[in-house]
């Protein structure tokens, strides 16, 4: 398994019902671009100030008050990425997944687009007509028993699902950090409204990772040092919870990482 962006998922698609000639097209992209307004979630409260996000070359600068974080790289291991049909309770509930469009089953390392790169290159695949309501996936901690080949190709991700590098600045004092997490969690990102694929038409879906909320403190009022959220650190559980609440999926007809 290579260190890849989302475009490489096309190499291992396993779509059901693609023998039908009257099919449509569904594409999936990835963005870390900040939404125009923070989506309602546990990551933000109505009384907290949202961090500001600025593109700085190939890095992303997150600022709140006198503190800032420069993110230079951010990688996440995903698996079982599936677009869920409106009449299915869960993609895992149906053997064979004929009722869900399956983008990826095995562990896949994706690199989040940072800086001036607003969206990862899209992939488009054939899909039967239908109405879809959510994107299901797992943030996956690779294990030696299930993911030996993946770990051999990506040794830094043995029992690690997320790796971020950058610089943390508190009141002008800077320190470099490497943040890793072993979050192992199923996620469902509900689309704002059901999306329909018609025969011969296309549906563009983007998964947003709201990086600006990952390193907020419990009160959502200040940034924490990402290094303090490593295994056993004081902010490990706070940041893990922020991460699990940072995903949104939406139709993206303009391919710009923003809803609409």
Per-region residue spans from a language model:
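Bacterial N-terminal signal peptides that target proteins for export
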Residues: 1-7
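A short, solvent-exposed, low-complexity linear motif enriched for acidic/polar residues
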Residues: 19-260
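C-terminal motif of bacterial Sec signal peptides marking the signal peptidase cleavage site
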Residues: 14-17
